Amino acid sequence: NMYQAYRSMYEAFGIKNINAILPPPQQPIPMDPSLEHILAISGKPFQAYPGQDHKAHIDAHLSFMSISMVQNNPMAMMGLQKNILEHISLMAQEQVQIEFMEEMKELQMLQQQLAPMMQNPMMMQQNPMAMQGQQRVQQITTAIEARKAVLIAEMTMDYAKEEDKISSEVGG
């Protein structure tokens, strides 16, 4: 991260008001699929964001990928495919958050309770309640990650089928 490297250097030199010399980088903003298509054919980066209509973005990108101009542009295809995978990951994460809402609340509560004990591993080992809490955290985390992996696999298979359809329509 170049910004952070320069910022650290300026801090080490004792420079005041670093933001006047080195403005913070602009945060990227979510955009609609057509703006992402423009960036894709221009070879510029774009990314998926939480809360977007991921299915709509994926559908729009798949349709756009069927256009010969896009298919003949490997960088655009790569950018669109990368973005679709980002949307799949976020869609799975958001689905897991809905499905595991109660478990996530429990997980947060357990982590808050265990945080002070995590500073002292000996205290953790000597406290059976802390060990049970740690096991429960692991259990919840494993269940969430397993479900997320299943969702990603299913969504990726759906994406692959749609991409195959596009390839066969263009090729045939």
Q: Each PLM stretch: what is its role?
A:
Residues 1-172:
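C-terminal anchoring/interaction modules
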